[in-house]
């Protein structure tokens, strides 16, 4: 599958601002299943960008605007090619996987993705309630799949019930939210079970005939570490393995590590308008 993504963030300010310092994480990844073919950034007012790779392996572009301005527009255009086949249902929990999963080396290696954050932390009784529902499952792959099924069945997708600061422990009580909330909740339970899990930000191609649900502007899903296999992507918002409709941009411990646009400025209030289009170029 080949896609073109056009992502526009426009900030309008009540009064002229200056000394605007910003960073963006909008460049899709290149990995074993996804290839970035084209990527460029347009910034208005014009500004040059510098690039670096953060601790999680995400590409970050930073820029500085010194002149007074009443609006800021960041437009990125990307073309990506994805070839990703389903395989999670084919995995068996071998003796080798069990040995790796129970080893201290495995725990130490993935400690950042076993440690809870404010976004992902769940109260012990909340974790217990979920585990009682899905059963005592020792196989981490099967546990992750069953957890995804549970969250899909019990959460209602509602963009009005939560906001960008909502935590997993709040969302699980509401049993509603958006992809960010459902992903944080799944990550929180996985980590409580001793399964390394990370947050994935990106784009979702829903198409005209797709049953997939999500906001193309900022879809999120989960990756968990299968011992001896690698990271496996699951989308609990849609109860599917994340495959060719899912375009990976950033990974981290939670949303805070992959926020698409971050910045500071001196001036008045702002209004943000986001526009995203994901177009299928070749299937």
Regions found by a protein language model. Give the residues of each.
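A short, structural micro-pattern
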Residues: 3, 18, 35, 68-70, ...
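Flexible glycine-rich active-site/ligand-binding loops centered on an Asp-His dyad
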Residues: 94-111, 240-241
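Hydrophobic/aromatic-rich core segments of domains that either
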Residues: 149, 181-270
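Secondary-structure boundary elements
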Residues: 105-177, 185, 193, 253-255, ...
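Intrinsically disordered, low-complexity N-terminal segments that are enriched in acidic
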Residues: 1-86, 93, 98
């Amino acid at each position: 599958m080949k896609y073109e993504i056009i992502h526009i963030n426009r900030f309008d300010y009540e009064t002229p601002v200056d000394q605007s310092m910003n960073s963006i994480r909008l460049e899709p990844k290149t990995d074993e299943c996804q290839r970035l073919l084209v990527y460029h950034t347009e910034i208005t007012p014009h500004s040059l960008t510098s690039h670096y790779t953060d601790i999680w392996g995400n590409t970050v572009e930073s820029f500085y605007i010194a002149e007074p301005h009443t609006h800021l527009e960041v437009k990125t255009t990307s073309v990506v090619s994805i070839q990703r086949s389903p395989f999670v249902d084919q995995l068996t929990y071998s003796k080798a996987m069990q040995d790796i999963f129970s080893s201290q080396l495995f725990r130490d290696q993935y400690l950042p993705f076993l440690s809870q954050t404010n976004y992902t932390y769940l109260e012990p009784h909340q974790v217990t309630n979920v585990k009682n529902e899905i059963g005592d499952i020792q196989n981490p792959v099967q546990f992750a799949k069953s957890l995804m099924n549970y969250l899909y069945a019990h959460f209602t997708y509602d963009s009005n019930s939560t906001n960008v600061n909502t935590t997993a422990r709040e969302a699980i009580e509401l049993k509603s939210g958006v992809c960010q909330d459902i992903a944080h909740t799944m990550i929180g339970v996985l980590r409580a079970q001793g399964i390394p899990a990370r947050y994935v930000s990106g784009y979702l191609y829903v198409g005209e005939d797709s049953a997939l649900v999500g906001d193309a502007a900022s879809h999120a899903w989960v990756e968990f570490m299968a011992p001896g296999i690698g990271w496996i992507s699951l989308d609990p918002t849609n109860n599917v393995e994340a495959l060719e409709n899912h375009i990976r941009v950033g990974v981290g411990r939670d949303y805070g590590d992959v926020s698409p646009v971050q910045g500071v400025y001196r001036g008045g209030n702002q209004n943000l308008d986001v526009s995203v289009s994901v177009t299928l170029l070749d299937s």
